[in-house]
A protein has these predicted regions:
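Metal-dependent amide/peptide-bond hydrolase catalytic core
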Residues: 20-27, 36-51, 55-202
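Acidic/histidine-rich catalytic neighborhood of metal-dependent amide-processing enzymes
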Residues: 1-32, 102
């Protein structure tokens, strides 16, 4: 989708894609930003070098601080540490530990707020002597300036089609789909469900 929008964005009048359950329509974009964070220390032997900084302990303190961030009001904003790793053995003071962290929101200004909070946590840790680095591993934009009338017309059309196919009026909600990029470029877009079932990401 990113490549399609790069090559043909100026010629696309509207965009429709398929994801999630058949009873749903995603008509608002949830943007996100994802990071790989690493903490490094000298490490050492758990007995002989006791007292040396432990990368896992340092990472744990970062996770605790990130989870104290108060999400902004307006829209829905979330964050998550989805994976952690580190250390080499039970009797080794960990020299390196890492995590995957993301935040999401259906408001662009809230994404910007969460990024500022994330950077403040890392900057404070660095100022206190922690060797911490990060890498951006994923960016999905929020909605841009989309013509409200054109977007509503597309959403209404999708609603009618789904209701005719299923006999049930679909539920509308925000989500992170292939519509994010065209919506960020101002292209009216909608994501229609395509399956019956449950348990996504389990």
């Amino acid at each position: 989708v990113r490549k399609i929008c790069e090559d043909y964005g100026g010629r696309i009048k509207s965009f429709c894609t398929f994801d999630s359950s058949l009873s749903s329509i995603v008509d608002r974009a949830v943007g996100s930003k994802r990071f790989r964070v690493k903490v490094r220390t000298r490490g050492g032997h758990s007995y002989n070098d006791f007292g040396n900084d432990n990368a896992i302990a340092g990472l744990a303190s970062l996770v605790g601080k990130l989870y104290k961030i108060q999400v902004p009001e307006g829209g829905k904003t979330t964050y998550n540490v989805g994976m952690i790793s580190g250390g080499t053995s039970v009797n080794t003071i960990a020299q390196e530990a890492g995590m995957l962290y993301e935040f999401r929101s259906d408001k662009r200004e809230n994404l910007e707020y969460m990024e500022r909070q994330f950077m403040e946590v890392l900057d404070r840790a660095k100022a206190e002597g922690m060797d911490v680095s990060f890498q951006v591993i994923g960016v999905r934009p929020c909605e841009g300036q989309v013509d409200p009338a054109q977007k509503q017309a597309l959403t209404d059309w999708a609603h009618r089609v789904v209701e005719e196919m299923t006999g049930q009026p679909p539920k509308h909600h925000a989500g992170s789909t292939d519509c994010n990029i065209p919506l960020s470029l101002g292209i009216p877009s909608v994501c229609v469900g395509s399956f019956r079932g449950a348990g996504a990401h389990t």
